[in-house]
């Protein structure tokens, strides 16, 4: 069995950070950097990948399989596949956020496996050991390829594939579900409704970039990437929106807006006091039970099966 240490490096590549320019002397150079990005892809704005092994699944006592398969453009993706404890009722495909890599999210597999689900955690192109470079369109294609891979290896008797998107992965999961009708249900945590809105929100946190916060998003970001433009197309498949009310990275109101654009069946669960992607830590067992129950109901399962 291939170990993750053969795929991941010991330390990450430092991410680009445009909001820590230390002095007024660099104000002009900071603006030049931003306007330079206007001529580039969204890669430098939204994505901060690295190849560090954050969590070793061996230390969690998790048996796993390192898997590789092609994305829709032929680039090789690397993922980690966890088997359910007991017979699997379905497979959860996890779409992570815009930073680090797949190894930062393995703890989620613990409760999902106990709930009867196989779990596929994969890296977008350019993250971890996956080939290529990420983009809004490309991450969706990577998720579609991952859903198809998971569908092809469903356990006997399993009811189907469901998606779990977190942070930027919410936009990815929404796009993938629209393109891949085999997806049975989605849990969407800590996401945003619009790439332009979240870009503007982040720019306004910096006094250097605030003056261009209204100008740059329309230049840098296409509306066609926005999940709120397509989320209604997922119906009648069920959606569970989750967000922490104390999220200072992605404001909870953005999930509320995305939920408002979705059609039924849908649920919105706001968790008081939870920060960005801290809902599991704050809500604990209630979080685990809510998600497992939601997925099981979406797959047509009852307490007796």
Where are these regions (language model features)?
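An N-terminal hydrophobic leader/cap segment in hydrolases
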Residues: 35-70
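Membrane-embedded segments
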Residues: 72-149
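Alpha/beta-hydrolase fold nucleophile elbow
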Residues: 155-167
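Hydrolase active-site cap/lid region
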Residues: 175-235
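Short beta-strand/loop motif that positions the catalytic acidic residue
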Residues: 234-235, 240-243, 247
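Conserved alpha/beta-hydrolase "acid-adjacent" motif
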Residues: 248-254
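Catalytic histidine neighborhood in serine/cysteine hydrolases
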Residues: 259-277
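Catalytic active-site module of serine/aspartate enzymes centered on a nucleophile-bearing elbow/loop
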Residues: 283-305
């Amino acid at each position: 069995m291939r170990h993750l240490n053969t795929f991941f490096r010991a330390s990450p590549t430092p991410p680009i950070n445009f909001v820590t320019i230390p002095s007024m002397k660099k104000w002009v150079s900071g603006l030049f950097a931003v306007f330079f990005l206007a001529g580039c892809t969204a890669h430098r704005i939204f994505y901060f990948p690295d190849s560090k092994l954050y969590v070793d699944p061996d230390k969690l006592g998790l048996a796993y399989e390192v898997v590789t398969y092609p994305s829709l453009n032929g680039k090789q993706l690397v993922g980690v596949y966890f088997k359910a404890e007991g017979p699997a009722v379905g497979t959860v495909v996890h779409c992570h956020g815009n930073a680090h890599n797949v190894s930062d999210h393995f703890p989620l597999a613990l409760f999902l496996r106990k709930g009867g689900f196989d779990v596929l955690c994969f890296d977008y192109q350019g993250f971890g050991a996956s080939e290529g470079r990420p983009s809004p369109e490309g991450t969706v294609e990577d998720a579609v390829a991952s859903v198809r891979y998971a569908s092809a290896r469903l356990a006997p008797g399993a009811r189907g594939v469901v998606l779990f998107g977190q942070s930027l992965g919410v936009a990815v999961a929404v796009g993938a579900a629209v393109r891949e009708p085999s997806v049975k249900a989605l849990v969407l945590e800590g996401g945003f409704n619009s790439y332009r809105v979240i870009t503007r929100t982040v720019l306004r946190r910096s006094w250097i970039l605030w003056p261009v916060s209204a100008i740059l998003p329309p230049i840098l970001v296409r509306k066609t990437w926005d999940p709120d433009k397509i989320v209604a197309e997922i119906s009648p498949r069920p959606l569970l929106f989750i967000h922490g009310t104390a999220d200072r990275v992605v404001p909870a109101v953005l999930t509320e807006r995305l939920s408002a654009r979705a059609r039924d069946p849908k649920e919105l669960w706001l968790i008081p006091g939870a920060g960005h992607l801290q809902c599991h830590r704050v809500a604990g067992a209630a979080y685990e039970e809510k998600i497992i129950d939601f997925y099981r109901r979406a797959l047509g399962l009852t307490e007796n099966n």
